[in-house]
Amino acid sequence: MNGSWITILSLLVISQLASSKVTLIGKNTFLSFDDVEANFTPVVRRSGEYGLLYAAEPLDACSYLTNMAEKGSKFRPSYVLIVRGGCSFEEKIRNAQEAGYKAAIVYNDRYEELLVRMAGNSSGVYIHGVLVTRTSGEVLKEYTSRAEMELLLIPGFGISSWSIMAITFVSLLVISAVLASYFSVRRHRIRQHVRDLHHGGQGHSRMPKDLLQSMPTEVYTGVLEEGSTSVTCAICIDDYRVGEILRILPCKHKYHAVCIDSWLGRCRSFCPVCKQNPRTGNDVPPASETTPLISPGPNSITSLQSFYDLPIVVRVYL
């Protein structure tokens, strides 16, 4: 639901950015109207174009205009208001240009007509041309030939319907990806929580550092104790070297201190070999997807490891 509202809001913002504006500015007056630029006239500058507005004579500008543009300062160019119909858009624009106007604002002659991009031959056309609705044109006509009123042409960003569709499609993809990631992470956390509950909160709880450091250690001398055949760390699968520090768990299994510290401090609090909890001395936890069904015996040469935690290793002495 939230994604739908985001998409709708994006479309509204894009539609506002894509439309250009015709704006009347005067003392205590500020009126703005949507317009569409012609496709054969120069594009309105980003900074906008402004000037004084006059009504064409004749109003349809299908013949040479009898009211020529006033020769004022170059900073106050003259714009002309023209009604649609009677001849082509191109003919209206060219007649306005011949009369010395710098821009032509054409308005629809019917209320129900939509704004379209006026078409024509761009050769020799150097003035701006825009189309507004009939309602906008009638309001603009009331403010023609008034020196205190200034007309400002504000360009749009020229976003086409295809661009809007592309942006909408990309937005939907991004929203879908975010939602998919959210539900994927949520599902993973739920599964992890269920797995922790299944193990009674012990098999995957992190061991406190102070308890870990309290377990005894010894320096490996290369001399095996009576009855001991372990010369390899079951975690990193490397042989012990003389001088290395080994940590001894309550179950009497030994490992590299670095390896077992990382193992027990990383959300695992059981012996990698016998699966006993070093804190409580509990027996092997119930079989699950993270613990094997059969624990290795003391005389076994095969060390079965957890499916997620350690690989299966077979060590053969020749």
From Swiss-Prot:
SUPFAM superfamilies, alphabetized: PA domain, RING/U-box
Keywords for the protein's UniProt record, in alphabetical order: Disulfide bond, Glycoprotein, Membrane, Metal-binding, Protein transport, Signal, Transmembrane, Transmembrane helix, Transport, Vacuole, Zinc, Zinc-finger
Top-level division of the source organism's lineage: Eukaryota
Signal peptide: 1-20
Subcellular localization(s) per the UniProt record: Prevacuolar compartment membrane; Protein storage vacuole membrane
Keyword Zinc tagged: yes
Membrane spanning residue stretches: 163-183
Disulphide connectivity of cysteines: 62-87
Primary location: membrane
GO biological process: protein transport
Cytoplasmic-facing ranges: 184-318
Glycosylation sites (chain numbering): 121
Lumenal topological segments: 22-162
Its membrane topology: Single-pass type I membrane protein
Zinc finger (RING-type): 233-275
Pfam families: PA (PF02225), zf-RING_2 (PF13639)
One GO location term (cellular component): endomembrane system
SMART domains named in the record: RING
GO molecular function: zinc ion binding
Function: Involved in the trafficking of vacuolar proteins. May function as a sorting receptor for protein trafficking to the protein storage vacuole (PSV).
Protein name: Receptor homology region, transmembrane domain- and RING domain-containing protein 6
Protein's organism: Arabidopsis thaliana
